[in-house]
Amino acid sequence: MNKKAPFLLFLVMSILSCSNEKSTVETFPAPTWKQADAINEAALTKEEYYDKILGLLVGSAIGDAMGAPTEMWHRDQIRIQDGYVTNLTTLYRPDSPEGPWEDFMEAGSTTDDTRWKYLITKFLTQKENIPDSLNAKDFANFLIDQYLNEMKALKGIEAFDPEPIEKQLKQMNWLQEWAKVAKPYAEGDIDKYSYTRDRFYGGEMACAGMLYAPMIGGVYPTNPNRAYLEAFRLGIFDIGYARDITGLTAAMTARAMRPGVTYSEITAVCYEIDPLRYGNSRLVGRLAYQSYQTVKNIVAEAKKVETPSEKPLEGFLGTAIELAQLDKAYELLDDHLQQIPFHAGEIHLMNLAAIEFAEGDFQKAVEFAVNYGRDNDTVAAVTGAILGAMHGFNKLPVAMREKTLAVSKNIIRIDLEELARELTDAKYD
């Protein structure tokens, strides 16, 4: 053995030791970040859960149905046509793949916002129990299968009359954009998936995941951190911070399921729940949280108004000062609109504004969302879902909840009570 070997070994170890000591000394002291634990904030009995999950479903459907007749209208046009909307009204509008599937449907009828609640519920309950963790590829394949079923039904139509074909085409076309993204995702084709996702609905930062996120929050009740992560995982159609908003929408719904929760505790999710650390993003920070800050400022400014509105508004049941405050809030929100109304950032902003301005009151919040216009049925559906989960079915406006249940079951053919039972059984049995 070389006599110098022990000396060389000692020399190397000494250098490494000094290097380690130097590295430790030069490392700047900083706090250790630990991801928040995904824990339940409260426990729900089976009966409590059923009331809240049904409240979520029906509350969302009420919002969808109230906004559907004036979807994409400017608020001035809503006031000219209907005054201030406080109830369910007939859908005097043509059918479309994303909208109602029939012309001039009865009051209480709904659009794709409610169809998505149905579809995600069927995905969540396809197994005996709600899985501990959701699988995005399973979700993609589920949507592909649904699209293929609609395509097969179209091919099987033998009719001279075009109406049956046109009707089935609407059902297939509704899922067409989604299926084009889901297929390469399920197949693991990263390039094709990124290309199709980035041109999904024209490449807009759409509110795709927000359409089904409340239901994910509903199956992870009182566990906003877990709900966020599961919804984020299934947000495969989202671009950019729209995916963070999808997670937050689920998280707000999950917290809304907690007994005794306040509206401010629900919206506080925007800064309390951040498992993927969007708040630590360089240069930008967390845009979804900035929307929360914007809304808090807007509502505070609007509530300062003390001069009554001079012009009455047909259908508005509040005071002249309350109308002036509402108009001020709308005016301030106008400065924060996106180019396309169904941009996730705009839907998120309007949802927060509705909840904060109405201080968690279901009726007032949904009215706020509907009467602003733009993509009002989607905003009202998200707001209605969150506050429906908060208050529960039994505390929703009686006439509207009963009308919505009946129309949904008998005309739309979506039985909301049955969906709630399926989710409850999958969760508790």
Q: What is each residue range found by the language model?
A:
Residues M1-N2:
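N-terminal secretory signal peptides that target proteins for export/translocation
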Residues A5-S14:
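Sec-dependent N-terminal signal peptides
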Residues C18-D429:
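Structured, active/binding-site neighborhoods that engage oxygen-rich ligands
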